[in-house]
Regions:
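Short acidic-hydrophobic catalytic motif
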Residues: 132-136
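Short, charged/small-residue-rich alpha-helical element at the C-terminal edge
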Residues: 140-167
Length: 167
């Protein structure tokens, strides 16, 4: 997320509101959604990374978009920040009316925030559906490509992992 560190959150949001031609009264609404109301008049340079992430989301929410796209929204956050971001994202469809699209490489992280998933590989949609459908269709294993498959399988088996070498 970007913002002017020497300005407050409210000042940063005022700039974005002007750029988006959004009424400034929308600033209070988005600050409340992202739980930054009490810190709105602090300089952004004093914010934690999680607070900066939430400010970035507030900027995106100005003007009430129908779709919000977040790329790795929990990346770099500490455990408390991750939990806070998960909760915020999970509540956003109800609090904002927006559809939230999240890009992430961490399926475990996604499972804690969403009810529908889409899996892309090299630009091709491989799966789209509910988490339950994904779990039902998963193979329950992973395919590894290694230089020495028999040696890798033996090492995994020594660690108690079920492994097989395809013929």
């Amino acid at each position: 997320p970007s913002g002017y560190l020497h300005l407050t959150a409210r000042e940063n949001l005022s700039i974005v509101a002007d750029l988006k031609d959004v009424e400034r009264k929308d600033i209070s609404r988005v600050l409340e959604i992202v739980h930054l109301t009490k810190d709105a008049d602090r300089k952004v340079g004093q914010y934690s990374l999680g607070m900066k992430q939430r400010l970035g989301i507030a900027m995106a929410l100005l003007g009430s978009p129908k779709l919000l796209i977040l790329d790795e929204p929990t990346n770099g956050l500490d455990p408390a920040g991750i939990q806070e971001m998960r909760s915020l994202i999970a509540s956003m469809p109800q609090t904002t009316g927006a559809t939230v699209l999240i890009s992430s490489h961490l399926l475990g992280e996604i499972e804690q925030m969403v009810d529908q998933v889409g899996i892309l590989n090299h630009g091709k949609l491989l799966f789209e559906g509910s988490l339950q459908q994904l779990q039902k269709h998963s193979r329950g294993g992973i395919l590894l490509r290694v230089l020495d498959a028999p040696k890798a399988a033996a090492a995994l088996q020594q660690q108690g992992v079920k492994a097989a070498v395809p013929a």
